[in-house]
Amino acid sequence: MLGAGCAAALLVAFGGASAESIEGSVQGNKSEQASSDSSKQDYYWKVWNGALPEQRDKGDHADVLAVLTGKFTGPPIGCKFGFRGGGLAPSTIAARSGTTVRIENRDAFTHELSVSGLPGFTPLESGPGKARAIPVPAGGPWELGDRIYGHVDGHLHSMRELVACATVTASGKFRFDNVPPGPYSLRILRGPEQVATRRVTVPAGKTLKVDPLNMSKSRRR
């Protein structure tokens, strides 16, 4: 939830316009099985023995992120990411080009975030409650990992006109809040790819409900 200061900044940025919500969902192109039964058995054995943290159930959409892009001068809305349940939540993250994104450690154990191919980023351990700030230049996407726990993976997208982020539930639903009225591009990111896009216009005074988006193979951003 935005604080009073951030909300005021949004209103100033859009000339006193109200802030609205967008509701939608994704469908199709479910995640493929990530590992064999034998590797799963090995993973759960290590969890039981305390060698690995227990990873949350990813379902079909833990690697999916909904974002809005467009003309917007305020800070990105709802773009909060972190480690939770032994992995990145969500595993696909986005940040505005030329800024930094914070990855909070919400687990009770230490993580060591790595970003493959990102110049100037040094993996360092982050204890419970700590956060790492990642500088995000133009380019990417970049692969994310954890030098302590090899099962952790993810991707970081750099987006020049990022406005807002929304996580996608296991049932495929997402919701943006506190979005100023106006035209935007609604984009669905999954791993290193953009798998759906649609132009939307947020009206003043009511929630915009978007028809389901079909996730497809990679599309250029």
Regions found by a protein language model. Name each.
Residues 3-13:
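Bacterial N-terminal signal peptides
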Residues 17-221:
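Extracytoplasmic copper-binding redox domains, predominantly the cupredoxin/blue-copper superfamily
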